[in-house]
């Protein structure tokens, strides 16, 4: 059965192709990239562009993680100063700051200049951490994964080792022409210790921005390849999902995962697992 005839692949679409919903609130443009209610998903993702002096209110009843893609913001949690986050001019410049808030936290972020924020949300189980915090670059786990033309930089912002309720997220940078999420892996079934089920969303940026990458999605039922450009989003509810950057262009993606637990146990495609075993 081909990918377009299978429900799994009908759900794996690039929202940017049909245009994400956009609303304006107090001059701030907020783009809803992934709306959980449309698909019964756990993950919500939105993008906010702020000018100097503008404030964004976030948080509330959901667990929230905000990644400062560029710019600087002053952060309040429940009316109390939390600190300052940001400073990079581009996601390709290096690791940035993020803000984590458990359910019941009222966040306010005020931009010191032009700023771009990615806002990830998920319903949190009981026992989520009780305090909001700013995640510094030094708090992240930064690693060079893979080798050769499947080498990439992975910045784990909120991993299993970090206190949170349900959200897992980080950033990956593919050098020009390189693969990531490779060897191909998936996490769509609950079968520990081999695999645990996690939904996932990718948000892409490209440098220079006129370039592109390719997002593959496949399983036993079918396969497809999506051209992804700067600002695109891919939902990954199931299947293997490797990514490659076009020659001459660096590819960034913010990855957000959520499931019933916070373990990251991917299952590698047996047909390609030898690649990892044979690396220097």
Q: Which residue ranges define each predicted feature?
A:
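A short glycine-rich, His/Asp/Glu-containing loop-to-beta-strand
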Residues: 24-57, 148-200
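Glycine- and acidic-residue-biased ligand/ion/polar-headgroup-sensing regions
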Residues: 60-83, 176-177, 188-232, 244
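Double-stranded beta-helix
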Residues: 115-155, 216-218, 254-280
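Acidic/histidine-enriched, beta-strand-rich ligand/metal-binding domains
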Residues: 198, 210-280
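Extended, compositionally biased flexible segments
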Residues: 44-110
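Hydrophobic, proline/glycine-rich low-complexity stretches
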Residues: 9-57, 63-74, 274-278
């Amino acid at each position: 059965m081909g990918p377009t005839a299978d429900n799994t692949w009908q759900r794996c679409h690039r929202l940017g192709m049909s245009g994400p919903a956009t609303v304006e609130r107090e001059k701030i443009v907020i783009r809803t990239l992934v709306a959980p209610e449309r698909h019964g998903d756990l993950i919500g993702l939105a993008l906010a562009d702020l000018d100097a002096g503008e404030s964004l209110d976030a948080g509330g009843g959901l667990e929230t993680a905000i990644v400062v893609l560029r710019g600087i913001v002053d952060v309040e949690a429940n009316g109390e100063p939390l600190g300052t986050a940001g400073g990079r001019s581009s996601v390709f410049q290096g690791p940035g700051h993020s803000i984590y808030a458990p359910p019941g936290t009222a966040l306010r972020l005020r931009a010191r200049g032009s700023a771009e924020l990615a806002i990830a949300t998920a319903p949190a189980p009981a026992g989520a951490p009780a305090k909001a915090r700013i995640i510094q670059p030094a708090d992240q786990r930064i690693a060079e994964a893979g080798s050769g033309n499947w080498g990439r930089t992975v910045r784990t912002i909120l991993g299993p080792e970090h206190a949170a309720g349900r959200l897992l997220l980080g950033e990956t940078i593919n050098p020009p022409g390189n693969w990531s999420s490779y060897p191909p892996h998936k996490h769509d079934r609950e079968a520990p210790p081999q695999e645990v089920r996690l939904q996932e969303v990718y948000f892409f940026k490209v440098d220079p921005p006129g370039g592109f990458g390719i997002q593959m999605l496949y399983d036993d039922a079918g396969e497809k390849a999506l051209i992804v450009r700067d600002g695109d989003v891919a939902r990954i509810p199931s299947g293997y999902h490797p990514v490659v950057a076009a020659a001459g262009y660096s590819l960034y993606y913010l990855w957000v995962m959520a499931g019933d637990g916070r373990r990251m146990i991917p299952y590698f495609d047996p047909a390609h697992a030898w690649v990892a075993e044979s690396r220097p």
